[in-house]
Amino acid sequence: MKLTDGVLRSFRVAKVFRENSDKINCFDFSPTGETVISSSDDDSIVLYDCQEGKPKRTLYSKKYGVDLIRYTHAANTVVYSSNKIDDTIRYLSLHDNKYIRYFPGHSKRVVALSMSPVDDTFISASLDKTIRLWDLRSPNCQGLMHLQGKPVCSFDPEGLIFAAGVNSEMVKLYDLRSFDKGPFATFKMQYDRTCEWTSLKFSQDGKLILMSTNGGFLRLVDAFKGAVMHTFGGYNNSKAVTLEASFTPDSQFIMIGSEDGKIHVWNCESGMKVAVLDGKHTGPITCLQFNPKFMTFASACSNMAFWLPTIDD
């Protein structure tokens, strides 16, 4: 089944899970698409089975809190940031609920975490205005970049380069093997006083970069030239909430939730809005991602919703 405007318009909520007492701040699909794991402001980690459509387990990180949860490549392991006490990143085995390693270094809250798609490298960005490069096998930071403002960061799909968004006005591209030489490309964007960048994502084909903001718009940027291709708006975000925007796995569409529980979908090429879907969420949709392997996506406020298409194309 191929994703088309019609298929996207046909998506409906198939299941809603009420496992959390506070907002879900992040979730991540496993590379196989078989499970999704969420972190929440209620300090819980919930693992869901996507095929059976049910929660499998709940773990807690009461002391440190949990945010920015990411699967690693090893089965049943995740990394996540703390959102209270300290700013150490933790590497957890879900199998026995034990920490494998800690990654200390950041002196302020971690605001972005990106796992390399190909190996054990990951990068983190913090309000301490640094990006750190790590290897899961060592607690020591493998690389450090001091930046001129609040950063966001992400690996490209090949794991060869990473992008840093700095101070909501600049995108810098680094080669992983020679990042200490500085960025090989810098794209200056129009600065917007009304909001700040909250995340940066590459499309799966590596050609596009999506800049999310805590305002009422998103920017789609050509990953090679740095030109803004489209600015997407027309969704509600009056309270400056961090809303997650995502590409579909075929790199053809972009989706974002809104504060009124609706999901807006645009075509990347034409820039046209193709669908507005009502998730009937009780609060702002803080997290939204398409499954990397199956024709389903998930959205979350304090509830988690699984969506399925209702037509067979």
UniProtKB/Swiss-Prot annotation:
One GO biological process term: DNA-templated transcription termination
WD repeats: 19-58, 105-144, 146-184, 192-231, 236-276, 280-313
Any one Gene Ontology cellular component term annotated for this protein: PTW/PP1 phosphatase complex
First and last residue of the signal peptide: none
Principal location listed in the UniProt entry: nucleus
Alphabetized GO MF terms: chromatin binding
Subcellular location: Nucleus; Chromosome; Cytoplasm
Domain of life: Eukaryota
Keyword terms, alphabetized: Chromosome, Cytoplasm, Nucleus, Repeat, Transcription, Transcription regulation, Transcription termination, WD repeat
InterPro entries found in the cross-reference section: G-protein_beta_WD-40_rep, Swd2/WDR82, WD40/YVTN_repeat-like_dom_sf, WD40_repeat_dom_sf, WD40_rpt
Pfam families cross-referenced by the UniProt entry: WD40 (PF00400)
PANTHER family reported for this sequence: WD REPEAT-CONTAINING PROTEIN 82, WD40 REPEAT PROTEIN SWD2
Subunit record text: Component of the SET1/COMPASS complex. Component of the PNUTS-PP1 phosphatase complex.
Family, per entry: Belongs to the WD repeat SWD2 family.
Biological role stated in the UniProt entry: Regulatory component of the SET1/COMPASS complex implicated in the tethering of this complex to transcriptional start sites of active genes. Facilitates histone H3 'Lys-4' methylation (H3K4me) via recruitment of the SETD1A or SETD1B to the 'Ser-5' phosphorylated C-terminal domain (CTD) of RNA polymerase II large subunit (POLR2A). Component of the PNUTS-PP1 protein phosphatase complex, a protein phosphatase 1 (PP1) complex that promotes RNA polymerase II transcription pause-release, allowing transcription elongation.
Protein name (database record): WD repeat-containing protein 82-A
Organism: Xenopus laevis (African clawed frog)
Phylogenetic lineage: Eukaryota, Metazoa, Chordata, Craniata, Vertebrata
Gene name, Swiss-Prot/TrEMBL: wdr82-a
